[in-house]
Amino acid sequence: MTEPDVAGAPASKPEPASTGAASAAQLSGYSRVLLKLGGEMFGGGQVGLDPDVVAQVARQIADVVRGGVQIAVVIGGGNFFRGAQLQQLGMERTRSDYMGMLGTVMNSLALQDFLEKEGIVTRVQTAITMGQVAEPYLPLRAVRHLEKGRVVIFGAGMGLPYFSTDTTAAQRALEIGADVVLMAKAVDGVFAEDPRVNPEAELLTAVSHREVLDRGLRVADATAFSLCMDNGMPILVFNLLTDGNIARAVRGEKIGTLVTT
């Protein structure tokens, strides 16, 4: 399952946010969020799981939940399998995508375990039925879990090949009535240029969906982005590797890049 990266380089300090409606929205904070995590980060750059990384993410999420915010999570599976890459090696695309979906379930179960060690009741819901390890994806049940203060992790992507976990994040956010998609990356946000090419590239702190589209800036894959743009769902792109950034994002502090209609 493909997950485009935001163009970026090693993290740098975010620039001051520009004024306007997007900044005003960011300052208001959020009560229900959909957190999108890339699978590669769970592996610490390697194949498999890095327990230290998963534990650090779980601690950040637990702090947010204890503050009364409802949080759902979508995790990629790139630390195990990436369907598009396996296809390039000759594997049939639909089969490789299903392998990627199973990778997201492994990540979901790992995060559930570390969250419950933090004392946070967590439910995993999967788009592919696997009753021994997770609930089936039922949006009304997911909302009920959130209202009870539980974390809900959505695994197995959309349950369909050719759809990325970015698209899953956008669709799930809309269906559960989230205020925002928090797109956690290994970079500070969205840049005007690729910082790997231009180290002085400007970090954009607030842009519109239309501007992202017109300028060809990479935030999420096209399907995910279209869903968010058409339905007015804001996306906040921020650096997960900075400890405490999930809580800062939820509080509406000026970090990363806020994309609004």
Curated annotation (Swiss-Prot):
It catalyses: UMP + ATP = UDP + ADP. It is found in: Cytoplasm. It comes from Mycobacterium tuberculosis (strain ATCC 25618 / H37Rv). Inhibited by UTP. Homohexamer. Belongs to the UMP kinase family. Keywords: Acetylation, ATP-binding, Cytoplasm, Kinase, Nucleotide-binding, Pyrimidine biosynthesis, Transferase. Catalyzes the reversible phosphorylation of UMP to UDP. One of its GO terms (biological process) is UDP biosynthetic process. Pfam families: AA_kinase. Gene3D superfamilies: Acetylglutamate kinase-like. Signal peptide: none annotated. This is Uridylate kinase.
